[in-house]
């Protein structure tokens, strides 16, 4: 009998939950262990299971003085890549992954943030990526975004897989890890809550996201399904 497929979810911020990824992972027979970093320490790489999912947060990648888990989390992602553990890093996770390998993040980028349903264009090589390939086949995808900080320099030797009209580094791969600036997990309700937390109009955001949710949800589910597929492959090979 095959063993259970397990993944670890790192949650830096109570305001940034796993949201729709929770039921999507469950429907793909992946058991999860959640690690809320305001309550627990960054885990050891040997305890991650078959995969690692790093969520976003309202803090920045440079807030290590207030959030001492930031450096250990970066070290964990490096260790996960060294161990060839499938890793998906979202928003803040994407930014921490970039800096962990020598990239650069600009906090509160003067060009402004991206919020709401945002078109992302895929570079040619993205269609071959084992995690993002199905999503990239369309050439352009509508995805949920909520960020003001930006990866302005990728790690040495790493190429961008996707760009938006405003920022060039929407997704990248380094070894077994993929970072995405967008939020494949975010529902219209969560996007509205984030808008309210930042002083915006949550009702307007929810309405706008509901208009596009058929496409946005489909695209997010493609990412979740591909991630789960990688976890099952790793589990069977173990």
Predicted segments — roles?
Residues 5-25, 38:
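N-terminal beta1-alpha1 ligand-phosphate binding loop
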Residues 10-13, 54-58, 148, 182:
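Glycine-rich His-Gly loop
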Residues 101-188:
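Pocket-forming structural segment of enzyme catalytic cores
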């Amino acid at each position: 009998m095959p063993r259970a497929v397990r993944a670890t979810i790192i949650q830096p911020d109570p305001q940034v939950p796993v949201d729709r990824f929770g039921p999507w992972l469950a429907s793909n027979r992946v058991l999860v262990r959640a690690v809320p970093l305001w309550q627990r320490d960054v885990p050891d790489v040997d305890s991650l299971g078959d995969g690692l999912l790093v969520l976003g947060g309202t803090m920045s990648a440079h807030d290590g003085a207030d959030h001492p888990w930031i450096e250990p989390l970066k070290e964990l992602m490096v260790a996960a890549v060294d161990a060839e553990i499938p890793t998906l890093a979202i928003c803040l996770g994407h930014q921490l992954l970039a800096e962990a390998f020598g990239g650069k993040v600009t906090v509160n980028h003067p060009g402004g943030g991206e919020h709401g349903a945002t078109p992302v264009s895929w570079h040619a090589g993205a269609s071959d990526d084992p995690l993002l390939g199905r999503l990239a086949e369309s050439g352009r995808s509508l995805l949920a975004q909520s960020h003001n900080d930006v990866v302005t320099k990728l790690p040495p030797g790493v190429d961008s897989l996707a760009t938006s009209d405003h920022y060039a580094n929407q997704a990248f791969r380094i070894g077994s890890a993929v970072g995405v600036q967008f939020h494949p997990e975010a529902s219209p309700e969560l996007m509205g809550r984030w808008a309210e937390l930042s002083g915006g109009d949550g009702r307007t955001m929810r309405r706008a996201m509901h208009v596009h949710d058929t496409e946005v949800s489909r695209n997010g589910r493609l990412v979740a399904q591909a991630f789960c597929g990688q976890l099952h492959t790793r589990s069977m090979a173990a």
